[in-house]
Amino acid sequence: MAFTMQPVLTSSPPIGAEWRYEVKYDGYRCILRIHSSGVTLTSRNGVELSSTFPEITQFAKTAFQHLEKELPLTLDGEIVCLVNPCRADFEHLQVRGRLKRPDKIQESANARPCCFLAFDLLERSGEDVTLLSYLDRKKSLRELISAAKLPASPDPYAKETIQSIPCYDHFDQLWEMVIKYDGEGIVAKKTNSKWLEKKRSSDWLKYKNFKQAYVCITGFNPNNGFLTVSVLKNGIMTPIASVSHGMRDEEKSAIREIMEQHGHQTPSGEFTLEPSICAAVQYLTILQGTLREVSFIGFEFQMDWTECTYAQVIRHSKPVHPKLQFTSLDKIIFEKNKKTKEDFIQYMIEVSDYLLPFLKNRAVTVIRYPHGSRSESFFQKNKPDYAPDFVQSFYDGSHEHIVCEDMSTLLWLCNQLALEFHVPFQTIKSRRPAEIVIDLDPPSRDDFLMAVQAANELKRLLDSFGITSYPKLSGNKGIQLYIPLSPEAFTYEETRQFTQLIAEYCTNAFPELFTTERLIKNRHCKLYLDYLQHAEGKTIICPYSTRGNELGTVAAPLYWHEVQSSLTPALFTIDTVIDRIKKQGCPFFDFYRNPQDEPLSAILHQLKKKS
């Protein structure tokens, strides 16, 4: 059973009691079969993928080993690399799918595991259930997922690599969530539908979350009727898509006439055209700088072709409040590399999937630079009176704190030139830390290697305790080590005991390197270990936030193998960090699923016994 039932694309979602709705994910459609002798993972075209995604097949063997009476069982679903509850990273999945060497596959599986999202049940206890109704199959799947103690809905921070896609009764309820998380779309399924092998059936309808972009027409192929459309990227007109679908006959005729009169015909017969004519297109996602599933909307004769920028495409790629406006996009804000406000906003949009989880439920403090990084700056933690209603906030009884959990709030703050985002160690409804952060602060940028040495010494110590730590550049001159904790697991008093223990060990074992002296003049060019900074009311620069310096450097998470003498903070800027994530993933990808409660509790227990 390899060839799967397929949904039909619809331009309007079906509404009614006879329909249920599921999130549509951008991944590899697969059949997962689990039986007593092993596991198989097969693509919809019959390609065996078990060895390509060992984190799924290996987990499947253990997840269902105590449910032998349920075997053999067969699940229909999607292999994805989750970014958030409604969206997957198809670009990373494609890279992963092309790997052939077992060692490279395992390395990628460890660094950024993919997961199988089950949305249908085809076989249970060896019995074919495809002829049961959709609702009955879904109920049976929920029972199975519950018995196996697997996530009932997609969770990018869960350790389990088999999860479930739930169904919703109401389209509007789910569509709001899909828009919020920038998901691919929704699949509507008839409640009485059977699962039909090798069929594309109108019992399943897919409704996609298309975006709109403005492009410049720069080429035309008369042989197939496709337009080449381009945008300004780094000052160069760069092709971003080929499009034919959606064009009316009269529009095609007009383009052909324009090309023949004003274009240049190449030896191959294709035409090129100097930038002049703008158009609006619809697309689904951006993959490696190219628009996917593109269709033509119409000409935009009132636009100037210089408005068709890649940054404009990125700005329109995320769901934001209709009242959000951007101003002075050409203002230079990072002087040394001449980066504009538009460049900054583009970076924040592209990094938002990795930044926002660390801002979630935190009372954020921003540092604003109204005239760019060379100008005066000021801190802001309260929501100003002039902020629009859509800007999120939290009232603690005395102050209205800014809370930044969505794109609209994030981009409003960016438009106010909030270049730095600082967060406390606890969430808005807690007085207990959600992580420990050890701040390694060398005397100057020229002394950064001291931070590298200090970080590695601390890693050896933490490893000896059985504690996993995560390094991050401060974005200025230092390194910060993160230790994740479960919510409400420890008090600040307890974490202070631990950070003080670390500080005392370091200053005693390496007196020439570390100091806890708060007065700069008394530090004698040693690295300052600020264990007092980890306290209620204190803040730390958020992962992936920019810093307000002339380069626009980023507080970038690191892999431990990168923390060596060749590490150069100046190379981690808004120009490089996005490409880095696309190629290497996020070093903090499993941060929230890896709390270090057990080893920390053991250390605190020993400290208590000694006292």
UniProtKB/Swiss-Prot annotation:
Q: Which reaction is recorded as catalysed by this protein? A: ATP + (deoxyribonucleotide)n-3'-hydroxyl + 5'-phospho-(deoxyribonucleotide)m = (deoxyribonucleotide)n+m + AMP + diphosphate
Task: Supply the induction statement.
Answer: Transcriptionally regulated by SpoVT and sigma-G factor.
Q: Which GO terms describe its biological process?
A: DNA recombination; DNA repair; sporulation resulting in formation of a cellular spore
Question: Which annotated residues bind Mn(2+) 1?
Answer: D26, E184
Q: Where is the active site?
A: K24
Enzyme Commission (EC) number: 6.5.1.1
Which residue stretches belong to region Ligase domain (Lig)? 5-310
Which InterPro entries does the record cross-reference, listed alphabetically? DNA_ligase_ATP-dep_cent (IPR012310), LigD_ligase_dom (IPR014146), LigD_Pol-like_3 (IPR033652), LigD_pol_dom (IPR014145), NHEJ_ligase_prk (IPR014143), NHEJ_LigD (IPR052171)
In alphabetical order, the GO MF annotations are: ATP binding; DNA binding; DNA ligase (ATP) activity; DNA-directed DNA polymerase activity; exonuclease activity; metal ion binding
Which residues does ATP bind?
E22, R29, R44, E78, F119, R200, K206
**Which keywords fit this entry according to its UniProt record?**
ATP-binding, DNA damage, DNA recombination, DNA repair, DNA-binding, DNA-directed DNA polymerase, Exonuclease, Hydrolase, Ligase, Manganese, Metal-binding, Multifunctional enzyme, Nuclease, Nucleotide-binding, Nucleotidyltransferase, Sporulation, Transferase
Q: Provide the cofactor list for this protein.
A: Mn(2+)
Cysteine pairs forming cystine bridges in this chain are: none
Residue numbers binding Mn(2+) 2 = D439, D441
Comment on bound cofactor: Binds 3 Mn(2+); 2 Mn(2+) for polymerase/primase activity and 1 for ligase activity.
Annotated positions binding Mn(2+) 3: D439, D441, D530
Which Pfam family is an annotated match for this chain, by its short name? DNA_ligase_A_M
- Family note: In the N-terminal section; belongs to the LigD polymerase family. In the C-terminal section; belongs to the ATP-dependent DNA ligase family.
Q: Mind telling me which NCBIfam families this protein's record contains? A: ligD_pol (TIGR02778), NHEJ_ligase_lig (TIGR02779), NHEJ_ligase_prk (TIGR02776), PRK09633.1 (NF007211)
Other information: LigD has variable architecture. In Bacillus lacks the 3'-phosphoesterase domain (PE) found in Mycobacteria and some Gammaproteobacteria.
- What is the name of the protein in this document? Bifunctional non-homologous end joining protein LigD
Q: Which organism is it from?
A: Bacillus subtilis (strain 168)
**Underlying gene:** ligd
